[in-house]
């Protein structure tokens, strides 16, 4: 327990006495002046064992996948299917929302002189979390309009109405996934939530991917968009990648400054994801769907390029200088 009380301490001591000593007498004092000698508390006589591997246990106890890039189009598609099967069977067993979330209300958030309008969609997820998704409507000639969806970053400060710098004629959906917006948590509660979700075979980022998908499905049910693209910047780039992998109606992915590896403690944690592959490997399973990189693709992500080239889709890996420069890729 994180907090002790005299009543709790006495109960603990009585349990120890009963089961370790066979002593049934009641404990009357929860504090003692007895100090155990340090030599009685030392483990391994105060010296760590030679060749201690505990500090690297995460690297070898459960072997990590080390995939080799496929070399032919057919091999690339087979490899992709294997990756998707593994991710859905291990890491994302219950992530995709099979049922539409319950729509609570749609609030009009006003507009601008240029014709831009905003709506806030309040919805409830399958596990009864009430969230908000902010739809920014940008007038344009294209019908139906493209839609760019993103998960709100926990680092984003609360503002009156979120927005996304997309091109004219492209609508944007910013989803306040759990832990952001109205459900933002302080550092202590955030860490507690991370631990609790793992107790039930989930993780906070995995639940955020669920929220992102739920909002996307909700909007698609009520509005018509083509194409639907998902965007992730920095720490939220993995959310975009995995949301698209789980939902084939998301036709394009846009990433900016993605993390280099899931082994970085600052990268979103997804249970057992490294048994399938690292982020750069799993992102390559998006083939043949287009991926647009804002800025430059990190050199460490060369595996992604190799897979797309092997599949004959190298032209579907694009780069743009800014998100506002993104336009749909004509690939189908």
For every predicted segment, state its role:
Residues 229-240:
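Gly/Ala-rich beta-loop-alpha elbow adjacent to hydrolase catalytic centers
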Residues 243-244:
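Aromatic pocket-lining residues of Rossmann-like dinucleotide-binding sites
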Residues 151-152, 175, 231-233, 256:
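Short His-Asn-centered micro-motif
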Residues 1-146, 154-171, 178-226, 248-252, ...:
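Alpha/beta-hydrolase-fold serine-hydrolase catalytic core, especially in secreted/extracellular enzymes
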């Amino acid at each position: 327990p994180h907090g002790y009380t005299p009543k709790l301490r006495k109960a603990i001591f009585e349990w120890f006495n009963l089961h370790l000593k066979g002593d049934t007498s009641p404990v009357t004092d929860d504090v003692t002046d007895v100090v155990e000698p340090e030599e009685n508390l030392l483990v391994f006589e105060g010296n760590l064992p030679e060749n201690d591997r505990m500090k690297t246990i995460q690297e070898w106890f459960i072997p990590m996948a080390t995939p080799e890039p496929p070399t032919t189009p057919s091999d690339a598609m087979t490899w992709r299917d294997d990756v998707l099967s593994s991710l859905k069977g291990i890491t994302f067993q219950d992530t995709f929302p099979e049922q539409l979330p319950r729509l609570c209300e749609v609030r009009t958030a006003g507009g601008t002189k240029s014709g831009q309008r905003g709506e806030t969609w309040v919805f409830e997820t399958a596990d009864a979390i009430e969230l908000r998704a902010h739809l920014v409507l940008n007038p344009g000639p294209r019908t139906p309009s493209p839609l760019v969806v993103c998960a709100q970053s926990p680092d984003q400060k609360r503002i009156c109405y979120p927005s996304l710098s997309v091109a004219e004629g492209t609508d944007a959906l910013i989803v306040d996934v759990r832990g952001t917006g109205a459900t933002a948590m302080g550092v202590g509660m955030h860490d507690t939530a991370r631990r609790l979700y793992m107790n039930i075979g989930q993780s906070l980022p995995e639940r955020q991917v669920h929220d992102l998908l739920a909002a996307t499905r909700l909007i698609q049910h009520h509005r018509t968009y083509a194409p639907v693209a998902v965007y992730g910047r920095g720490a939220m780039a993995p959310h975009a990648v995995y949301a698209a992998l789980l939902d084939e109606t998301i036709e394009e992915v846009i990433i900016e400054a993605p993390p280099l590896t899931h082994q970085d403690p600052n990268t979103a944690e997804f249970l057992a994801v490294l048994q399938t592959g690292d982020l750069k490997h799993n992102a390559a399973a998006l083939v043949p769907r287009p991926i647009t990189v804002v800025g430059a693709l990190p050199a460490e992500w060369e595996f992604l390029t190799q897979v797309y080239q092997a599949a004959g889709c190298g032209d579907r890996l694009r780069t743009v200088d800014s998100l506002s420069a993104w336009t749909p890729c004509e690939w189908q």
